[in-house]
Amino acid sequence: MAWARDEGGAAVLEILVQPRASRTRAVGEHDGRLKIQLAAPPVDGAANAALVEFLAAALGVRRADVELLRGETGRRKTVRVAGITAAAAVAALAS
């Protein structure tokens, strides 16, 4: 998938976030990125925290293993997930 790659022993994910959705879930690929709908609003970092929590739970890693590299204030985000490969991330999130 174009939205996931291996880099330095971790998976790097390109994500498009839609805050204030009815529920938190991954909805598929959009514009070369994984689109994730978040129930949290984009206020005071709530959406970023919800994204980290969702990814950690979906990928079976600790929240500390999920690091936001780019996009702290935007909808387009780049996230590094330690302890998992890009192929494993795609399998977990695309299902």
Swiss-Prot record:
GO annotation, cellular component aspect: cytoplasm
Pfam families tied to this protein: DUF167
UniProt cross-references to SUPFAM superfamilies, sorted A to Z: YggU-like (SSF69786)
Superkingdom of origin: Bacteria
Family note: Belongs to the UPF0235 family.
Protein name stated in the entry: UPF0235 protein A2cp1_1215
Organism placement in taxonomy: Bacteria, Pseudomonadati, Myxococcota, Myxococcia, Myxococcales
